């Protein structure tokens, strides 16, 4: 049983130097007695107590097909929500094989139909009312992946690669203003996504784990049949690395370095409404910009006082600790000014919205104490 209670009373008045916009122009020198007009006004009162039922079934089996080891996982998830009287059934399956090769490889293929049920934010339309005809967003997807474990310079490594494609419909578009998200409250979009991910994990330095990952992905949507444009979550290229090292004579002293580079996400679409508060669904096609690329370097230095290997302590007060590490971290070490979103400023004369970047935190320091009893 769920309970959602919502009261909305939102309005915007643009005022400057004694006059408000939009205004009815009058002859200079005469009194403007026109009514005060708001740029938009949204009001709604909602109170619902819906019931949601859900369940799932799963089947797993491992067996040999000749010399090939086979893993099968299949299942189905179902739910019903009486707010919109929708029943969804989501089947999915994964099939994996591990050949009897000298190389340690695992191949997997997975697919299914997945639903994202709407909740408070998604069911609320731009008029401030709950839409009882809203449907779950749906994705039909297939994923191919490979795990390759090997040894290089006599140290263990694992390379994981993955490629996927998703066909999506019944999407609910949303708008971004600064870090605020507002959904359209309508299933008026469809889209697709595809991408490739690769991650190398292993001991670049003996005894400590590090990793490198890279990915490329695109996400598009088509709102009201107007054509495909990038979704606000369109990530494009991303590269990241986590590297650890230690002093040979003092292995309990460790340093780590984290590098991240990512193409900028779409800047989002301003919440564009007319004077009656009606949404402008053309806006996403007018504001196709991307944020600047995201770049960040984090540096950390730590000292391991106690662990279960070379620094084990028996007896006394410190014997109560299984692990004890003190670390100092510098986040965003090069003080790079990254942009997280845009704040949209409206020009009342042209009704165009200009983006003003919202910056993330610059360089800062952190001291961390980790322990395990």
Predicted regions and their residues:
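Transmembrane beta-barrel strands of outer-membrane/channel proteins
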Residues: 1-2, 74-78, 93-95, 109-113, ...
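Outer-membrane beta-barrel transmembrane domain signature of Gram-negative proteins
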Residues: 1-69, 188-195
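Surface-exposed extracellular loop regions of Gram-negative outer-membrane beta-barrel proteins
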Residues: 46-82, 90-92, 200-202, 206-218
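Residues that define the transmembrane beta-barrel architecture of outer-membrane proteins
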Residues: 49-55, 87-89, 138-142, 165, ...
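Gram-negative outer-membrane beta-barrel transporters
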Residues: 63-67, 165-167, 187-274
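Short loop/turn motifs that connect adjacent beta-strands in outer-membrane beta-barrel proteins
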Residues: 64-70, 100-106, 151-157, 206-207, ...
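Membrane-embedded beta-barrel scaffold of Gram-negative outer-membrane proteins
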Residues: 98-100, 108, 136-194, 326
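C-terminal beta-signal and adjacent terminal beta-strands/loops
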Residues: 210, 260-278, 303-373
């Amino acid at each position: 049983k769920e309970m959602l209670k919502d009261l909305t009373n939102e309005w915007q008045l643009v005022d400057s130097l004694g006059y408000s916009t939009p205004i009815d122009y009058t002859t200079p020198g005469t009194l403007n007695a026109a009514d005060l007009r708001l740029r938009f006004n949204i009001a709604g009162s909602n109170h619902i107590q819906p019931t949601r039922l859900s369940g799932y079934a799963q089947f797993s089996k491992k067996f040999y097909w000749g010399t090939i080891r086979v893993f099968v996982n299949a299942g189905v998830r179902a739910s019903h929500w009486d707010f919109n009287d929708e029943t969804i059934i989501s089947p999915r399956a994964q099939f994996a094989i591990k050949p009897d090769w000298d190389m340690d490889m695992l191949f997997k293929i997975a697919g299914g139909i997945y639903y994202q049920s709407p909740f408070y934010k998604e069911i609320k339309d731009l008029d401030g009312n709950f839409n009882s005809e809203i449907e779950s967003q749906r994705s039909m997807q297939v994923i191919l992946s490979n795990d390759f474990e090997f040894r290089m310079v006599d140290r263990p490594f694992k390379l994981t690669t993955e490629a996927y494609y998703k066909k999506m419909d019944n999407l609910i578009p949303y708008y971004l203003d600064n870090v605020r998200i507002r959904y359209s409250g309508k299933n008026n979009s469809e889209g697709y996504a595809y991408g490739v991910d690769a991650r190398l994990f292993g001991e670049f330095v003996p005894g400590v784990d590090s990793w490198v990952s890279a990915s490329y992905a695109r996400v598009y949507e088509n709102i009201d049949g107007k054509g495909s444009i990038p979704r606000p979550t369109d990530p494009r290229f991303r590269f990241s690395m986590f590297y650890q090292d230690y002093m040979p004579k003092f292995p309990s002293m460790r340093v780590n370095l984290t590098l991240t580079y990512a193409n900028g996400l779409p800047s989002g679409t301003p919440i564009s409404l007319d004077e009656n508060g009606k949404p402008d669904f053309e806006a996403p096609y007018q504001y196709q910009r991307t944020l600047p690329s995201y770049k960040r370097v984090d540096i950390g230095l730590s000292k391991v006082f106690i662990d279960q290997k070379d620094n084990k302590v028996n007896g006394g007060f410190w014997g109560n600790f299984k692990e004890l590490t003190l670390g100092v971290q510098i986040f965003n070490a090069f003080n790079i000014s990254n942009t997280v979103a845009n704040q949209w400023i409206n020009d009342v004369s042209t009704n165009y919205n200009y983006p003003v970047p919202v910056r993330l935190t610059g360089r800062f320091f952190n001291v961390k104490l980790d322990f395990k009893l």
